[in-house]
A protein has these predicted regions:
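N-terminal, leucine/charged-rich tether regions that mediate assembly and partner docking
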Residues: 1-95
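Extended alpha-helical coiled-coil "stalk/arm" regions
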Residues: 191-233
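Short, charge/polar-rich alpha-helical segments
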Residues: 162-200, 246-247
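Active-site oxyanion-binding pockets that recognize sulfate/phosphate
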Residues: 174, 236, 243
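Aromatic sugar-binding surface patches on proteins
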Residues: 84-91, 225-228, 232-237
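C-terminal amphipathic alpha-helix
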Residues: 242-284
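Extended assembly-interface/linker segments at domain junctions
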Residues: 70-176
Length: 284
């Protein structure tokens, strides 16, 4: 009677980390990270967890400096791979994770230099047998690193999907690059529409000047015509500057699209080097 059935996942004592909840990756860093998605395929025994990283200052973020460690309540010989993508996104794939794992912890660690954490270790995990309950933290308690954030994922049917597909590093990277290219192309079209609007405004200003000059022939003295022409000329100058800015934006967009396309070609040819995968049987 039990064939083909699955037990209801046992709830752990640890609280789930919420989605899109950004937390600091360092006391002296403005880098923040959030888990944005987690899906599990119980038939094919794999999980896909997505993260997004951002900087309050807008500074560039080296995703290669962000490492992950995996811990489990019910330890299984799983393999996990960290895949940095474009647009500050990271995908972590966990293979060989079977139903009954109860809860896992993914700890993101910022390996970028941080003076306040140089002398601190990185020794504790939420899922240690004697640890207290916690959902996530921007520090590792009193003895750990202040450059890490812990994400707890409890076993839950709500985010299970047998339709979930596991892509390899190449596929995830190419998919993300193509998405970025599509976004850039939309932005390019927007810039072209702006240019058309700026040009239309210039033509309207020129027509206004022409009309003012024609009307001035029949007036003894009219300062309003002179003022109107001055305003129109000023607006023409502004619109021309706007056109230059949009054309510069288009040039940058075209350059970035070409770089992404080159990266896709390098990924397809094998020239692009990925991070090596990680294997774990037990993490404390």
């Amino acid at each position: 009677l039990l064939i083909g059935t699955r037990l209801v996942p046992q709830t752990s004592k640890y609280s789930d980390t919420g989605l899109n909840n950004y937390q600091s990756l360092g006391s002296n860093s403005d880098v923040q990270i959030a888990m944005t998605s987690r899906k599990y395929n119980p038939e094919k025994d794999f999980m896909v967890v997505q993260f997004n990283v951002k900087s309050d200052s807008g500074a560039a973020i080296d995703l290669q400096k962000i490492k992950f460690k995996l811990a489990m309540i019910n330890v299984q010989p799983v393999k996990y791979t960290v895949i940095p993508l474009t647009n500050n996104q990271i995908v972590v794939t966990i293979r060989g994770i079977k139903s009954g794992y109860q809860a896992i912890q993914l700890k993101a660690i910022n390996k970028a230099p941080n003076a306040s954490a140089l002398d601190q270790g990185d020794t504790t995990d939420v899922l240690n047998t004697n640890s207290s309950s916690s959902s996530s933290s921007s520090s590792d308690d009193e003895t750990g690193s202040t450059n890490s954030v812990k994400f707890i994922i409890n076993e839950n049917k709500d985010f299970e999907s047998t339709k979930l597909q596991l892509l390899n590093q190449k596929d995830y990277t190419i998919k993300a690059l193509q998405k970025q290219i599509n976004t850039l192309r939309k932005n390019r079209k927007h810039q072209q529409k702006l240019i058309a609007a700026y040009q239309a405004q210039i033509e309207a200003d020129k027509q206004s000047i022409e009309n003012n000059n024609a009307d001035a022939k029949y007036k003894v003295s009219d300062s309003s015509s002179s003022t109107g022409n001055s305003n129109a000329q000023s607006d023409i100058s502004t619109q021309r500057d706007n056109i230059k800015t949009s054309r510069k934006n288009i040039k940058k967009i075209d350059q970035q699209i070409e770089l992404y396309q080159q990266q896709i070609r390098d990924v397809q040819s094998g020239k692009y080097k990925f991070q090596s995968g990680s294997t774990t049987s037990r993490l404390k």
